[in-house]
Amino acid sequence: MIIVTGSFTAEDSFLADALALSLEHVRRSRTESGCLSHAVHQDVENLSRLVFVEEWSDRAALAAHFAVPGSRAFAKAIGKFAAGTPTLSIFEAQRVEL
């Protein structure tokens, strides 16, 4: 399984637009093959900071996601809304039973 985390802090004047675009992006992404989960969360300590957590079945599914025109457009649009540089981290993981 591939886990992706990312975040950005929106300029205050763009927060509503950033929220709407982010929700549109995660809802579309959830329909893609290999997407196990995709969510956006608003940081309760900084409401302008949006945090993304994604789970993908494998690297091929994530690569396909990054190739979707909507994903590329989302990344470009976030750059216009962000106050600072967005973060993105990708991890390979396996589920552990306790």
Predicted regions and their residues:
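Hydrophobic packing within well-folded, soluble alpha/beta domains
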Residues: 6, 18, 38-40, 50-52, ...
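Short, surface-exposed ligand-recognition loops at beta-strand->loop->(often short) alpha-helix junctions
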Residues: 10-15
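Short, glycine- and small/hydrophobic-rich beta-strand elements in well-ordered beta-sheets
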Residues: 26-51
